[in-house]
Amino acid sequence: MNQYLAITSRGLENLLAEELEQLGAQSIQVVHAGVRFKADQSTAYRCCLWTRISSRIIQVLSEFTVRDDMDLYLGAAAINWTEYFSNATRIVVDFNGTNREIRNSQYGAMKVKDAIVDRFTKADLRRPNIDREQPDLRIHMRLSGEKGVLGLDMAGSGLHQRGYRTEAGRAPLRETHAAALVLKSGWTPGQPLLDPMCGSGTLLIEAAMMAADIAPGLKRKRWGFESIKDFDKDAWLEIHAEASVKARRGPAKVQTKFFGFELEHRILAIARDNAGRAGVKELINFQQGDATELKAPEGFDAGIVICNPPYGERLGTTPELISLYTELGNRLKLAFAGSSASIYSGSNELLSCLRMRADKQFKLPNGALDCVLKTYLITAGSVKKEEGEAEGHVEQENVAPDFANRLKKNITKLNKWAKKEGIDCYRIYDADLPNYNAAIDKYNDYLIIQEYAAPKTVPEEIARRRIMDVLRATIEVTGVQTDKVILKVRERQKGKNQYQKLSNAERHIIVNEYGVDLKVNLYDYLDTGLFLDHRITRKMLGDMAKGKDFLNLFAYTGSASVHAACGGAKSTTTIDMSNTYLGWAQENMELNNQVGDQHEFIQADCLQWLQEVDDTFDLIFIDPPTFSNSKRMKQTFDIQRDHIMLMENLKRMLRTDGKIVFSNNKRQFKMDLEKLNELGLDAKNISDKTLPMDFAKNKHIHNSWIITHKED
């Protein structure tokens, strides 16, 4: 008997061991991400053909210590490779793992290849050809610490390649992984099986192949073991013929009902084609359907619902996924009492949105992603009908009740105020409760939830659960559609980090602020193009601007310039270093019919521009960053260190009766009044007057000043 190593994913070792035992393997030993066993040739062929879970089966030729590249070379060279394959065989070396001395898998593969080639040349034989694209035989080397295992890949390519899937849907599961999920779900042939988000059908196809007794490797055209010298062709043909007979007869015996639902016609067509190639098309009832409107089909009694819903590696997809999982949970409880569900996801937080208690759970990584399969027994008690309620009402769980109650109170108070003020966008929650450290801003009928990064003392799992609770409760309290809820994560703002781009969605909406229309981008940046805490400051500038020449420095998207123009400014000059934001500022002006040569837009480093220009203005607004070391600026800037230098330049540009409105976001900013006095300037702190009601609890979000020439 030969020694073999069957490779699988972490968490599936015991399941694979059971499968191999049923196939006749002996001396079975579970190891990390694999199973060792012994078998004769016929049993090894049968394992390759019939395994549904293993990704590769390696015939182990040698195990040896690998401290460095010399150990690796000598260990590989000790094998008499000419006994296993001829020099006409096209080979490739797959190298998995590293250690302190061998840090590169390509280098490791090269050393093994050199040892193999040298073994042939020392025997006066032509060296075998290396073929990375279509090798006849793959040499497999695994390195873990100082332990090396070297052998021959019996399959040649991954055993997940069943031959039926030429196209896949979004984020497809490997066939071996899908088969394992079906087996872990507790499903047995004879039970109805339904996938409400079937995609390209892999879960259902794997289950149907089990029910029909179709060998998963039956459609493979090439096998690595066919190129090994001791290949027993007669034994293989007998095993393959036996499996072929079972595949022809099996489907007709199947009584199990399989149901697959998919929203997209194109993906559904792929699923049907895949099932056809697998030989199980007639066994699966594929239908177009929405998982959030799922109903139990006729004949689905005491079955299993299995699915792998999306779980969003991109954070911005989370609000819509919360709704998806919540509605899926509702449908399961409403329509599938007496059945069970197995849901596979990479997010425990999203699984909690099902609002169902898991009966079992299995940690089953999907590649590099940590995922879990949870199974649920769906009982009639999951659904509660109150007097006067519609049939099939699902009792709702109270999510984050303290947060939800605070949000309700805030909304009741702020909605009335905002309507009276005449504003479309405002903050409805600002980290009011320490356990729910987020800000929520309303932009028309959109919501932006900004999660402040949790302190290091808060475990990541708890922080993730809390923001998930914020999302769920916000959606429930406000009733806002999930595609209009945007989640962002940010540090507490230190200066303005609006220039950090998050995506390229380029989705804009128009909001109104005191009669002024402004364009905002809710998706692409941490900030939207409009700082809500400066709302009163902008209105004040509009009230002050009539007949005046107005200068806006560090202008961002020019919203202050628009207010000034709409307030009757004689001219506006808008300066920012970013062409993108200057273009945005021009669009904002055009939205309000403020066009003409009196409105100038200049791309420049504001600090340098101040030193070079002699123009004067009646009204100047400057809201500089707290700190900047932009590559496009010639020098660093610190608002505390440099504000007097800034005022010295601004004084030169300020007309006799002019005013500077100066603001910044440094929480501990201290105006140097003594040096300001030496410059001949007066400063009046107006921070309390510019703090809007929706930011009243965050008194240090900005500080604002009016600065004028000292009276003689």
Curated annotation (Swiss-Prot):
EC number assigned by the record: 2.1.1.173, 2.1.1.264
Role noted for this protein: Specifically methylates the guanine in position 2445 (m2G2445) and the guanine in position 2069 (m7G2069) of 23S rRNA.
A GO MF label: rRNA (guanine-N7-)-methyltransferase activity
Residue intervals of the THUMP domain: 43-154
Gene: rlmL
Subcellular location: Cytoplasm
Principal cellular location given in the protein's record: cytoplasm
Keyword set, alphabetical order: Cytoplasm, Methyltransferase, RNA-binding, rRNA processing, S-adenosyl-L-methionine, Transferase
Disulfide bonding pattern of the chain: none
Enzyme class of the recorded protein, top EC level: transferase
Keyword Transit peptide applies: no
NCBIfam families in UniProt: PRK11783.1 (NF008748)
Keyword Acyltransferase in record: no
Reactions mediated catalytically: guanosine(2445) in 23S rRNA + S-adenosyl-L-methionine = N(2)-methylguanosine(2445) in 23S rRNA + S-adenosyl-L-homocysteine + H(+); guanosine(2069) in 23S rRNA + S-adenosyl-L-methionine = N(2)-methylguanosine(2069) in 23S rRNA + S-adenosyl-L-homocysteine + H(+)
Family listed: Belongs to the methyltransferase superfamily. RlmKL family.
Any one of the GO CC terms: cytoplasm
InterPro entries for the chain: 23SrRNA_methyltr_KL, DNA_methylase_N6_adenine_CS, RlmKL-like_Mtase, RlmKL-like_Mtase_CS, RlmL_1st, SAM-dep_methyl-trfase, SAM-dependent_MTases_sf, THUMP_dom
Protein name as it appears in the record: Ribosomal RNA large subunit methyltransferase K/L
